[in-house]
From Swiss-Prot:
Keywords recorded for this protein, A-Z: Ribonucleoprotein, Ribosomal protein
NCBIfam families named among the record's database cross-references: rplM_bact (TIGR01066)
UniProt name for this protein: Large ribosomal subunit protein uL13
General function of this protein: This protein is one of the early assembly proteins of the 50S ribosomal subunit, although it is not seen to bind rRNA by itself. It is important during the early stages of 50S assembly.
Organism placement in taxonomy: Bacteria, Bacillati, Bacillota, Bacilli, Bacillales
GO cellular component: cytosolic large ribosomal subunit
Length: 145
């Protein structure tokens, strides 16, 4: 009788991927990266185990936003003090902190659990073309579409 394969920490092989965000649309890039972080691009995907790979995103400052999202899309955060709500538009966030724009988008597509937090820690975003992970020998990843 065959049994369904269940991955565990001992039989997971993790790779490092480098993705160039220049000219890419925010949502399309984010959904594909979230899929890689979860491990859904592998045949050994197991929902309750972190089977995902490490992802390095470079040129985050050159990401594209379609339509009027730069002025209309608003990101909120709260300090947990009365009147402590802060808001910033996607355009301001892209100019001031493009890494956070991508991280927020991608981590919002991961599960809201301890497993999702663990998967989110395998994401590294850099605004420029340089990254300090050359020792891991990352492979270039070609996005679909």
């Amino acid at each position: 009788m065959r049994q369904t394969f269940m991955a565990n920490e001992s039989n997971i092989e993790r790779k490092w991927y480098v993705i160039d965000a220049e000219g890419q649309t925010l949502g399309r890039l984010s959904s594909e990266v979230a899929s890689i972080l979860r491990g859904k691009n592998k045949v050994t995907y197991t929902p309750h185990v972190d089977t995902g790979d490490y992802v390095i995103i470079i040129n985050a400052a050159k990401i594209e936003l379609t339509g009027k999202k730069e002025s209309d899309k608003i990101y909120y955060r709260h300090s947990n003090h009365p009147g402590g709500i802060k808001s910033v538009t996607a355009g301001e966030l892209k100019r001031n902190n493009p890494e956070r724009l991508l991280e927020t988008s991608i981590k919002g597509m991961l599960p809201s659990s301890r497993l999702g937090e663990k998967q989110g820690k395998k994401l590294f975003v850099y605004g420029g073309a340089e990254h300090p992970h050359a020792a891991q020998q990352p492979e270039n990843y070609e996005l679909r579409g």
